[in-house]
């Protein structure tokens, strides 16, 4: 049987992979957004695991709120990204931090 520690270890591995994705690839905005979403999903998995093993449904309800915020964040981030690509013809972070003046 899968115990709580298995879920927590898997969540920690996913969270660590997302942190590594953020630190190792700072050039591409799409990879940064995907790493942030992976981080949120790792936290959600821990919430669901704690909720399941404690018998309380509050953690699972909280996950729905986090998923809603994550979906809105992804939609706004991709909209900003498409506007930046239309204006600057690039999605590299180092090229986007320069201001026109």
Curated annotation (Swiss-Prot):
Keywords: Cell inner membrane, Cell membrane, Membrane, NAD, Quinone, Translocase, Transmembrane, Transmembrane helix, Transport, Ubiquinone. Its main location: membrane. It is found in: Cell inner membrane. It comes from Thioalkalivibrio sulfidiphilus (strain HL-EbGR7). This is NADH-quinone oxidoreductase subunit K. It catalyses: a quinone + NADH + 5 H(+)(in) = a quinol + NAD(+) + 4 H(+)(out). GO terms for cellular component: NADH dehydrogenase complex; plasma membrane. The chain crosses the membrane at residues 4-24, 30-50, 61-81. NDH-1 is composed of 14 different subunits. Subunits NuoA, H, J, K, L, M, N constitute the membrane sector of the complex. NDH-1 shuttles electrons from NADH, via FMN and iron-sulfur (Fe-S) centers, to quinones in the respiratory chain. The immediate electron acceptor for the enzyme in this species is believed to be ubiquinone. Couples the redox reaction to proton translocation (for every two electrons transferred, four hydrogen ions are translocated across the cytoplasmic membrane), and thus conserves the redox energy in a proton gradient. NCBIfam families: PRK05715.1-2, PRK05715.1-3, PRK05715.1-5. GO terms for biological process: ATP synthesis coupled electron transport.
